[in-house]
Amino acid sequence: MQILFVASEVAPWSKTGGLGDVAGALPRALAERGNEVVVVTPRHGSIDPRAAGLQPVRTSLHVRGEPVALWVKRGPAPVYFVEHPHLFGSRRGLYGDGGRDHPDNAERFAFLTRAALALPGALGLRPRILHLNDWQCGLGPWLLRHEHARDPALAGARTVFTIHNLAYQGLFPKQVLPALGLPWEVFRWEAMEFFDQLSFMKAGLAFADALTTVSPTYAREILTPEGGASLDALLRHRARDLHGILNGIDVHAWDPARDPHLPAHFTPGELAGKAACKAALQREVGLPVRRDAPLAGLVTRLAEQKGIDLVAAALPALLARDVQVVLLGSGDPAYEEAFARAAREHPDRVAARIGFDEGLAHRIEAGADLFLMPSRFEPCGLNQMYSLRYGTVPVVRSVGGLADTVEDFDGFARGTGFRFAEYTPQALLTATRRALDVFRDRRAWRGLVERGMAEDNSWERSAARYEALYRTLAP
């Protein structure tokens, strides 16, 4: 099956979050199953074509009469990079700079989507599925119906629109419609109008043939007023077309048996390397090397969506239980300063690294005993799956993909982590204390670790579910 996969970011070339990871891994997994997958994404200003090994493409691609240059990264699922010197090439930030969105994001991502839809005709492709991701590609289903209805390259193509995070909706003033080349008739409540603004997210939800999101629990949550970000009525109307398909992880990049970022390697049957990773991590971040001290890790955005307010409130009680904490992340300046201050005040208990370091993220996953993810909401989440694979026991809130991937320990021989429901510091503390009690029981703890490491969270499983959905749309 030929699939056109469109995303505003694709790891490792561009990434701000889970969307980039999905767009970098799912197309490859689909290609490994025998599908012909082509990925389309912008050539952001942060991407150096020469350093990335991109090749220029000779093509007659045009968007609204304007010629468009293309680059390609060859591979099992080739990635085509759409060039536009002003809209993309001159920008370092993918969506904004200095904490502010680019003011022309509507024009930028309408251009990307139009370029993606024009690409099959320019390259001689005949995709049966157009897989469009998040608000940035939300205009795609409408554009397919109204601007490509007679395009032979897209004849019979069906659309899948994936919601990675419903909270980000691509909202713009209605006055941008003429600049986008859209008729005023789309600005209706049953189309793209959303509280007197134009919503790219709503466009995708209203016009795509099938909707997916990144975990079964999140698919249920967004049907409710509490989780639906004011789009729950539309989503309930389309509930039969909505599918929750759990994300996977790259089990080659995240493999404790051969991860190049680690000082030692380990497997479920031989865990000595994990103890070595813990000691090395403690030395690296300046904590006392203590095998007996539970080491809790966090790799996170410092934002309330991630529950960082709960961690900050619970931190004094955690430290009173002789817990060491290592945090890697950036975000809200107030939380950056709060954790930097905690590290200064408790240098033997807290280590805070503000920013991001890919290697250190791997070493935290390998060296920590516990991993804290108390998210307010979490469409899928990846770090809890990395933790399971690395024998690090997750403590998570029972929302979204966290509820789908972490089974609560039953006190005997079932479970892979510890879950809690209420969004309060006390609930986080209670779950963490349960984990600490089991940590003292080496036999029970090893069982938790081994069960987590045995979980299959590969992209192969997720790709099979997407492929099955595609075939129901385009038999």
Curated annotation (Swiss-Prot):
Query: Any idea what this protein is called?
Result: Glycogen synthase
- Whether Cell inner membrane counts among this entry's keywords is no
- Residue spans making up a coiled coil are none
Molecular functions (GO terms) = alpha-1,4-glucan glucosyltransferase (ADP-glucose donor) activity; alpha-1,4-glucan glucosyltransferase (UDP-glucose donor) activity
GO cellular component term of the entry, any: cytosol
For the ligand (ADP-alpha-D-glucose), the binding residues are: K15
Supply the EC number(s). Answer: 2.4.1.21
Query: Catalytic activity, per the record?
Result: [(1->4)-alpha-D-glucosyl](n) + ADP-alpha-D-glucose = [(1->4)-alpha-D-glucosyl](n+1) + ADP + H(+)
Please provide the record's keywords in A-Z order.
Glycogen biosynthesis, Glycosyltransferase, Transferase
List the pathway annotation.
Answer: Glycan biosynthesis; glycogen biosynthesis
Q: What InterPro entries has UniProt attached to this entry?
A: Glyco_trans_1, GS/SS, Starch_synth_cat_dom
Q: What NCBIfam families does the record point to?
A: glgA, PRK00654.1-2
CDD domains xrefs: GT5_Glycogen_synthase_DULL1-like (cd03791)
Which GO BP annotation is one of this protein's?
glycogen biosynthetic process
